[in-house]
Amino acid sequence: MADKAAEAEQRAAQVIEGVLKDAELEWESPASGTYVVKLPGTRKLSTTVSLIVGRHTLSLNAFVIRHPDENESGVHRWLLERNLKLFGVSYAVDPLGDIYVSGRLPLPAVTPEGVDQLLGQVLEAADGSFNTLLELGFASAIRKEYEWRVSRGESTRNLDAFTHLLQRPSSRNDPE
């Protein structure tokens, strides 16, 4: 039995390393069966994923955003609704309220296609949802940051995705 488990771990590690090399991703293996992978993003600069090959499962975790400053229940509701649409991974919250993507896969299911699909799901969940999560949990901070940058003549280019948050709704008494 122990030999079969060791063989499954070794095979899973080989599959993971092959996928990471083929995808030309930046990664390191600080310990046998442990991988730290940097996934490039479009909204979030990058997402770091930890992959750990255990005796029976491959587990993965990736940090998404810190504990929301505001609208925590709205953020959590959005995460739970979004979990219904994800495959192989789900959002999780740690004891500090920070948000992660986590997943677990049985070692016999670790295939090149499966690992690629999991990494794609992590990227979609962490990077694809990044701006939405910022809007939901940090709208006030975004507004303050924008005002601070404008007052100092600094670039607001990386806040362009949030311009709709910066426009104040007009009052009914305002002339059009």
Model-derived features: positions:
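Charge-rich, low-complexity N-terminal segments
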Residues: M1-S46, D94
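Conserved short hydrophobic interaction patches
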Residues: V19-D22, W78, R82-L86, L118-T132
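Short, charged/polar, Gly/Pro-enriched secondary-structure boundary elements
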Residues: R43-T47, L107-V110
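A short acidic-to-branched-hydrophobic micro-motif
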Residues: T47-R66
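Short, internal acidic amphipathic alpha-helical interface segments
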Residues: N61-S102
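A generic structural motif
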Residues: V64-P68, L105-G114
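A contiguous, mid-protein "functional segment" used to position or interact
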Residues: P108-R149
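Short, highly charged C-terminal tails/helix-capping segments
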Residues: L134-E176
